[in-house]
Amino acid sequence: MSTSFMKSPRLFFTSESVTEGHPDKICDQVSDAVLDAFLTHDPRARVACETATTTGLIVVIGEVTYEQGYIPIEEIVRKTVKDIGYTDASYGFDADTCGVMVAIHGQSPDIAQGVDRALEVRGDGYVTDEEVATIGAGDQGMMFGFACNETPELMPLPIALAHRIGRRLSRLRKEGVLPYLRPDGKSQVTVEYSYGRPVRVDTVLVSNQHAPDVTQDQIRHDIIHQVIHAVVPPELIDEKTKYFVNPTGRFVIGGPMGDSGLTGRKIIVDTYGGMARHGGGAFSGKDPTKVDRSAAYACRWVAKNVVAAGLADRFEIQVAYAIGVAHPLSISVECFGTNKVSEETILRLINEHFDLRPGAIIRDLRLRRPIYRPTAAYGHFGRDDIDAPWEQTDRAEALRRAAGL
């Protein structure tokens, strides 16, 4: 999002979310459920787990290094699918009867040696766990973090509302309030901005899989009144707000029967809804030595603390890494003209208050715990309903004092 966004008197921005029963999200959740199982067995496990699904089938592939022991992957897959809500063959997909194929093997030793001992300290002899420099980045790449003061969770409003709608759909389905809903669904919200501030919701789109015998009129009424109006603040809705509910007119065939799914295909849904840049790396199925995940979490942590400290109203950070190297290659910041102190000062304060080496990120955010399955639906950021330590603003006060604010 450029600085022109802050200068425009009228601008529209749209973000989407998907429900936990979307085929791509099934795969993300399976990959993270498998990851959590390995981390429960061995907190230092190295995991790269990918999942694909189509009609009647889930395939789990990847590379894993861990202390030997039995991990019941097929059982984990079926339980995850059942928890999502695919419990009846009439939905087009059933946890008990779908096929499950597993093809997982060991991590490449060439990659492992770079992660195990970072380039700066690699050599003969044992390196202790306490030396954070011993963990090098698991791959090259750049990661972004973002925060803004549009919402209490310091997230962009369009993606925040889209996620709230998705969670509400899931809750009403699972509680039996709207029993005709099925697990697959999508939401999309368009917000009107004026000079960088949200002023109203222009359009809300909801598509949700449903039973064949329910009418479109009932679906539209229930979704507008029990879902949209329940989560969108009334002051943001006016007589010009537009609603689209299942605009194709019918959404009976859904889930993996309607579309194939794959881990890592909803990276914008997972992050900031397109409001911020993205380095391209997906999160789910990756242990925290993979900086695609851990560094993106750290960048969100930094950005949220900068905004919570009042150093800027909108803030984006980029961090870049080389495989096997612990220290970031570069760190850059962008405040979109909203900063209260210079960007140079903010960058200096970040370097003083945050250690962005992979080992330090894992240590400070306690990332070797099995906390990832809940992140795999409804966004990794802006969450107060799950264990997400990168959402803490524990360094905001120190940043504020150091900046003289």
UniProtKB/Swiss-Prot annotation:
Q: In which pathway does it act?
A: Amino-acid biosynthesis; S-adenosyl-L-methionine biosynthesis; S-adenosyl-L-methionine from L-methionine: step 1/1
Entry-linked CDD domains:
S-AdoMet_synt
Cofactors: Mg(2+); K(+)
Top-level taxon: Bacteria
Q: Which reaction does it catalyse?
A: L-methionine + ATP + H2O = S-adenosyl-L-methionine + phosphate + diphosphate
Query: What is a single cellular component term in the Gene Ontology annotation?
Result: cytoplasm
Subcellular location(s): the record lists:
Cytoplasm
User: Which residues does K(+) bind?
Assistant: 50
Q: State the EC number(s).
A: 2.5.1.6
Principal localization reads cytoplasm
Q: What pairs make up the disulfide bonds?
A: none
InterPro entries on file: ADOMET_SYNTHASE_CS, S-AdoMet_synt_C, S-AdoMet_synt_central, S-AdoMet_synt_N, S-AdoMet_synthetase, S-AdoMet_synthetase_sfam
One Gene Ontology term of the biological-process aspect is: one-carbon metabolic process
Positions that bind ATP: 22, 184-186, 250-251, 259, 265-266, 282, 286
Role this protein plays: Catalyzes the formation of S-adenosylmethionine (AdoMet) from methionine and ATP. The overall synthetic reaction is composed of two sequential steps, AdoMet formation and the subsequent tripolyphosphate hydrolysis which occurs prior to release of AdoMet from the enzyme.
On subunit structure and binding partners, the annotation says: Homotetramer; dimer of dimers.
Name of protein: S-adenosylmethionine synthase
